Amino acid sequence: LSPIELIFQYLMSLNFNLRKGFDIKLKGRAVEETGDHIKQSSFAIKPTDLIGITRPKLLRHIGDELKAGTPILFDKLSENVMYCSPVSGEIIDIVRGEKRTLEEIRILPDKNIKYVKHKIFSEEDINTLERVEVINCLMTSGVWPNIIQRPFGFVADPDVKPKSIHISFFDSHPLAPSFNFLYSKDLNYIKVGLKIINKLTDGKVHLNHNRKSIDSFKIDGYENNLFNGPHPAGNVGVQIHHIDPVNKGDVVWSTTPFGLIQIGKLFLNGIYDASKTICLVGSEVKTPKYYDCISGFSISDLVNSSVKNENVRIISGNVLTGKSVGNEGYLGFYDNMISIIPEGDKHSFLGWIMPVMNKLSFQRAFGLLSFLTPNKEYSLDTNTNGELRAFVQTGVFEKVLPMDILPNYLFKSILAQDYDEMEELGIYELVEEDVALCEF
């Protein structure tokens, strides 16, 4: 872009420079190339991934044949929202946990995927669609769970109209993938997805960028906002706080670029397409890179031949908010990365108080002189350096949370179950990922 275009772009956007936060620089970032095809032997839908489901009801049973997009379960509290199979095949197992909690529905895939066929719309047809028809298509097809509502980060309630919708076009988590590499090839689907979700609100649709993503994903007709700063600047909750805060009685929705792509493919191609590109990252990965896969695939199909050592933590998602799944687990519904780091089951002499040169420290309490090499990457393990401790008023939480919220007092009010104080201290604006750095 020319200097004049850059100045115009700056003036036409909301710009936020966030100083609070902390970038955890880890070894093992993915190079921008796609690895060999993964032979995906099995898949699973995990209701525990689907935020806000409290009473899942199965629609299929072991031995049932499926197509990609066949409804498998729904939540009794929102019976019209369907959760669908990512592939065609046969249900081979239903895994339950304590008190018969539904944990996984495992699927043996066909060699060639067969899809449930939905109505195909031209771009002219899309322009004339009504909100009710859009919602019905999204709910019955399996695409609706990509839309998340604030407060509390649940799957959106289709009976509520949000005051605005937000999409973050960058991820600031440790070792996060490049959205330019993941999604720039699907820009047309993203534009169609935006047309669709624009019909779901009377308010504005906000596209939130950093300096790397705004050139690729700045789309006219929507609010394009620019965020700069350390993690959690890429969290949509932080962005909502600065653009359109959630107060008592407010509802705001968010989705992701992948969610927009799924919506675009549904309306243009008439299918529920769960294919995605993810990155395999971490200091224990031989060659960190990107891979094409389908949501919910068995992680062992990829990681068994990719790890350097056996004693590792395999995480579906990022190291701050992902879930430890082991090498027999499955990729989470919302995850676009698999992180592998050393297991922290070894004890070191004097523990965290031992002065060393190779540790990352926010407070410079250890990791002597680490502040002299701010761009150094570290191989961190999962060791928490001790047991659970009481809150100590150090002021650190406030330094890593770029929001007008007092996290220490909010956490204490949550522990005390003081609902009035929670409301006053901003509980409606937060979900777990927004305060994950406080636990680092």
Feature roles, as predicted:
Residues 49-56, 60, 66-69, 78, ...:
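Generic structural motif
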Residues 2-59, 74, 224-227:
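N-terminal, Lys/Arg-enriched amphipathic/low-complexity engagement segments
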Residues 37-40, 90-96:
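Short, solvent-exposed cationic patches
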Residues 40-44, 55-57, 63, 67, ...:
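A common structural microfeature
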Residues 73-76, 201:
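A generic secondary-structure signal for well-formed alpha-helical elements
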Residues 81, 95-440:
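Buried, small/hydrophobic-residue-enriched core segments of structured protein domains
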Residues 66, 72-73, 291, 299:
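Generic structural signal for buried aliphatic residues
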